[in-house]
Curated annotation (Swiss-Prot):
The lineage of its organism: Eukaryota, Fungi, Dikarya, Ascomycota, Pezizomycotina. Its EC number is 3.2.1.67. Residues 35-54 are annotated as: Disordered. The gene is pgaX. This is Probable exopolygalacturonase X. InterPro entries: Glyco_hydro_28, Pectin_lyas_fold, Pectin_lyase_fold/virulence. It comes from Aspergillus terreus (strain NIH 2624 / FGSC A1156).
Length: 434
C-alpha cells in the first residue's frame, strides 16, 4: 500500500512537470509558488534566433557540435537538441561563457562510459572529490525540455565498488551561473551527485525529474539530487527525486535558499551539511526554507550534519573534521513522511563512530535559530522506540532549536526522541535518555 501511494503521488507530480514544458516562464519570480525567493530573481530576456545541434547519430562524440551551436546562438538565441536525435558527449565541456541563451533539450544526451578519460579530464571543484562532466555558467541561461540527460552511471557504480577512490563525475554542473532557470528536465543514472550548484546566484530549478538505480549488486552511491555550494538565492521546487542519498544538501556557504513542493523517495533527507569537514575553513549556512515535502523510504527527513572537532572518517574517500562556522535561520515546515528512519536528525558527530571522542572534541561549528514544524507520518521502525535524534556535542554550540507540531510515530506507536545538549523546553516532543 505504501508503494502504491508513492507511485500515485509521483505520477501526479510528473504529469504536472510534463505539462509545464510548453509554458516556460521567463518571469522567474512569478514561477515561484507558494513562497517567493529571499530576493527577487531577474527575468529572462526574449530569444530571437534558433540553432539546432547536429548529431553523428552513431555514438561518435558530439561535443564539438554542441559548442558550435552555443557560440552561434549565444547572446540572445535558443539552442535546440532535437527530439528525434541522440547526442553523445565524450569531451568535458566548459560552457561558462553563456549569455542570454536557452538550451532546449528535446532529445537524449548521454555521456560516454570512458572512465579513464573522465577521471583525468572532468572539471574538479575542490570539495569532497566533486567533478563534473561539464560546467554550465554565465548570465541568464535557461535549460529545459522534455528530453533527458543520461550519465551512463552503471559502469561507475561497478567501478566505485571495486575502487572507492574513483572520481565519479556529477551529471549537471551549474558553475558560476547568475540568473537562470533549469527545468523541466529529466536526469538519469548520474555516476555521483545529480546536480552541483556552485558559485552561483539567482537560479531557479523547477520541474526536475531524477531517477536512476543500479542493475547490479553494486548500489548507486552518493547520488544526491542537489548540492548547493558557495551559492545564494537559489530556488528548488516542483520536482521528483528517486535516488540513494540526500534529496537536497546545503553544502558550505549556501545562503538564502528555498526548497518547496518536493517528492523525495529513497533518499537521506533534506540536509544541512555536511559542514565543518575541513580544518581552517569557515562554513556558513543560513536563511534556508524547506516547505511542503513528502519523504518516502528514506533514512531522514529534516537533517543537520556537522563534523566533530576531531579527525574522522565516514568512508575511505570522505574524511575530515575540525572546521568551523555557523548554521542559522533554518526552517523546515509542512512535511509528510512514510517509512523514514529518523524524522529529525541533528548531529555534530558526523563521520565519527566514537561518541566519547565527539564529546571530548566538540564541534567548532554552531547551530542556532532552527525551526522544525508541522510534520506528520510514520517512521520505518528501524530506530524504535525513537523516531528522532537531536544531539549536540556541547551545550555551548547549540541554541534556539525549536520543534513544534510534529506528529510522527513509529509503526509500534512510540514517539521518543534522543535529546542531548539542547534546551528541551523548546522541543515539543517526547525527549528520552536514548
Amino acid at each position: 500500500m505504501k508503494f502504491l501511494h508513492t507511485v500515485a503521488q509521483t505520477a501526479t507530480l510528473l504529469l504536472s512537470l510534463g505539462a509545464s514544458v510548453e509554458g516556460f516562464n521567463r518571469a522567474r519570480n512569478d514561477a515561484c509558488k507558494p513562497h517567493h525567493p529571499f530576493r527577487p530573481l531577474p527575468a529572462s530576456t526574449p530569444r530571437t534566433k534558433t540553432c539546432h545541434v547536429r548529431s553523428h547519430g552513431d555514438g561518435t562524440d558530439d561535443a564539438a557540435f554542441v559548442l558550435s551551436a552555443l557560440r552561434k546562438c549565444n547572446n540572445g538565441g535558443k539552442v535546440v537538441f532535437d527530439a528525434d536525435k541522440e547526442y553523445t558527449i565524450g569531451t568535458a565541456l566548459d560552457m561558462t561563457f553563456l549569455r542570454h541563451v536557452d538550451l532546449e533539450i528535446l532529445g537524449r544526451i548521454q555521456f560516454t562510459n570512458d572512465t579513464d578519460y573522465w577521471q583525468a579530464h572532468a572539471f574538479r571543484h575542490g570539495f569532497q572529490n566533486a567533478t563534473t562532466f561539464f560546467q554550465l555558467g554565465g548570465t541568464d541561461v535557461n535549460v529545459y525540455g522534455s528530453g533527458t540527460l543520461d550519465g551512463n552511471g552503471q559502469v561507475w557504480y561497478d567501478l566505485y565498488a571495486a575502487e572507492p577512490l574513483t572520481l565519479r563525475p556529477i551529471l549537471l554542473g551549474v558553475i558560476g551561473l547568475h540568473g537562470g532557470t533549469i527545468g523541466p528536465l529529466k536526469l538519469r543514472y548520474s555516476p555521483q551527485w545529480y546536480q552541483l550548484v556552485a558559485n552561483s546566484t539567482d537560479v531557479l530549478f523547477d520541474g526536475i525529474d531524477i531517477s536512476g538505480y543500479s542493475s547490479s549488486k553494486n548500489t548507486a552511491k552518493n547520488t544526491d539530487g542537489w548540492d548547493t555550494y558557495r551559492s545564494s538565492n537559489i530556488v528548488i521546487q516542483n520536482s521528483v527525486v528517486n535516488n540513494g542519498d540526500d534529496c537536497v544538501s546545503f553544502k558550505p556557504n549556501s545562503t538564502d535558499i528555498l526548497v518547496q513542493n518536493m517528492h523525495c523517495n529513497g533518499s537521506h533527507g533534506i540536509s544541512v551539511g555536511s559542514l565543518g569537514q575541513y580544518k581552517g575553513e569557515i562554513d556558513i549556512v543560513k536563511n534556508i526554507l524547506v516547505y511542503n515535502i513528502s519523504m518516502y523510504n528514506a533514512s531522514d527527513m529534516a537533517r543537520i550534519k556537522v563534523w566533530p572537532g576531531v579527525d574522522s572518517a565516514l568512508s575511505e574517500d570522505l574524511q575530515g573534521g575540525g572546521g568551523s562556522g555557523a548554521v542559522s535561520n533554518i526552517t523546515y515546515d509542512r512535511m509528510y513522511i512514510e517509512n523514514v528512519d529518523w524524522a529529525i536528525e541533528v548531529t555534530q558527530c558526523y563521520g565519527q563512530k566514537n561518541q566519547t571522542l565527539c564529546n571530548q572534541y566538540p564541534s567548532n561549528l554552531t547551530i542556532s535559530d532552527v525551526h522544525i514544524k508541522n510534520m506528520w507520518g510514520t517512521t520505518s521502525g528501524k530506530r524504535d522506540p525513537n523516531v528522532g535524534t537531536i544531539v549536540c556535542s556541547s551545550p555551548d554550540v547549540c541554541s534556539d532549536i525549536y520543534v513544534t507540531n510534529v506528529n510522527v510515530t513509529s509503526p509500534s506507536g512510540t514517539d521518543d526522541y534522543i535529546c542531548t545538549n539542547v534546551d528541551e523546553s523548546l522541543l515539543d516532543v517526547n525527549c528520552s535518555s536514548g
